[in-house]
């Protein structure tokens, strides 16, 4: 299976650089994964596609203000993308610099001195030497880390709009994009309809933007991300399945979390890292349907939806979306695959 099989041509003007005024004003492409039937809807129509007895699983991870700036003691400028916080004074980060900082050197993160303890590939381990911790630095100076394809700096509204309304657990460096469409009003409508809701956590790493760089899909090594699938979520899933309801995931992060926890065919609580890679030929043990945005060509995420719905059906759906001028990627429109 070749990575090029998952390529498609996207007109640049269809990349959504800005969100719509209202979260739930986006469009929704409905794809039947059995028949390949495609239909166009508004996102607010999603309420009509779910039933009492179904379970919606959301990822409650919160995007960090993970982009920070600083300098070497020489004054040379540095740019940071915080990847993972080990404790308030110790964290892993990417550093953009003309010349990489040496292990053992001291550098500034904004106005605070930090020591470079280690480097592994492009990832640095830093320990803050000053009084402030990384949470304080992000709160005071941090920027929302918009993806490179938006080709713009973050603006004030991004702090709210690049975040879901139910975000709770700080730790992601990218938005849970399928969840961005859910307004507080729509969440209330879902509850009022008698549809159950559950929350898992997967902290999205910067590897989500990493293109697949090998020719053979099976050779790709996924980045690891931290997930939590609690006991009560597993109980809800088992109950839903027993009662004939559907488990509907909001976003590929929720898919990867549940399929990690259900790898042995039975959903079990899971706390730790996952590097699960779902591509055509892989089996889904838990997920019955999903809401997901439109994904980058040749990405692991377009491979995931192709595994769920069949590659030819996905490519046809994407071609339809392009012809109908859907908006793509993080701030773009969504699909409901069932």
Curated annotation (Swiss-Prot):
Pfam families tied to this protein: Queuosine_synth
Cellular component aspect of the GO annotation: cytoplasm
Job of this protein: Transfers and isomerizes the ribose moiety from AdoMet to the 7-aminomethyl group of 7-deazaguanine (preQ1-tRNA) to give epoxyqueuosine (oQ-tRNA).
Top EC class of this enzyme: transferase
Quaternary data: Monomer.
Keyword terms of this UniProt record: Cytoplasm, Queuosine biosynthesis, S-adenosyl-L-methionine, Transferase
The protein's annotated pathway: tRNA modification; tRNA-queuosine biosynthesis
Keyword Protease annotated: no
Protein name (record): S-adenosylmethionine:tRNA ribosyltransferase-isomerase
Keyword Cytoplasm: yes
Single Gene Ontology MF annotation: S-adenosylmethionine:tRNA ribosyltransferase-isomerase activity
InterPro entries assigned to the protein according to its UniProt record, in alphabetical order: QueA, QueA_dom1, QueA_dom2, QueA_sf
GO biological process, one term: tRNA wobble guanine modification
Similarity remark: Belongs to the QueA family.
Protein location: Cytoplasm
Reactions that this protein is recorded to catalyse: 7-aminomethyl-7-carbaguanosine(34) in tRNA + S-adenosyl-L-methionine = epoxyqueuosine(34) in tRNA + adenine + L-methionine + 2 H(+)
Known EC number: 2.4.99.17
Main location per the UniProt record: cytoplasm
């Amino acid at each position: 299976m070749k990575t090029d099989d998952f390529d498609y041509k996207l007109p640049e003007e269809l990349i959504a650089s800005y969100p719509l005024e209202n979260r739930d004003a986006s469009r929704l492409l409905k794809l039947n994964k059995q028949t390949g039937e495609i239909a166009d809807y508004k996102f607010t129509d999603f309420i009509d596609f779910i039933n009492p007895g179904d379970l919606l699983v959301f990822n409650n991870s919160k995007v960090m203000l993970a982009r920070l700036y600083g300098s070497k003691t020489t004054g040379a400028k540095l740019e940071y993308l915080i990847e993972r916080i080990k404790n308030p004074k110790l964290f892993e980060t990417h550093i953009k610099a003309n010349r990489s900082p040496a292990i053992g050197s001291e550098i500034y993160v904004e106005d605070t001195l930090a020591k470079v303890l280690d480097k592994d590939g492009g990832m640095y381990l830093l320990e803050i030497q000053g009084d402030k911790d990384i949470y304080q630095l992000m709160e005071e100076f941090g920027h929302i880390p918009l993806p490179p394809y938006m080709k713009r700096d973050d603006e004030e509204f991004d702090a709210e709009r690049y975040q879901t309304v139910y975000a709770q657990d700080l730790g992601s460096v990218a938005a849970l994009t399928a969840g961005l469409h859910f307004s507080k009003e729509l969440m209330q409508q879902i509850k009022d309809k008698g549809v159950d809701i559950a929350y898992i956590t997967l902290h999205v790493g910067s590897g989500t933007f990493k293109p697949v760089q090998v020719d053979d899909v099976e050779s790709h090594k996924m980045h690891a991300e931290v997930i939590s699938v609690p006991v009560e979520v597993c109980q809800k899933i088992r109950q839903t399945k027993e009662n004939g309801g559907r488990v509907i995931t909001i976003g590929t992060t929720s898919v990867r979390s549940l399929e990690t926890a259900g790898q042995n065919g039975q959903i079990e609580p899971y706390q730790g890292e996952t590097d699960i890679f779902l591509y055509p030929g892989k089996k889904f043990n838990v997920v019955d349907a999903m809401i997901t945005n439109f994904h980058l060509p040749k990405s692991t995420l377009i491979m995931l939806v192709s595994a769920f719905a069949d590659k030819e059906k996905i490519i046809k759906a994407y071609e339809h979306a392009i012809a109908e001028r859907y908006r793509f990627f993080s701030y773009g429109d969504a699909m409901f695959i069932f």
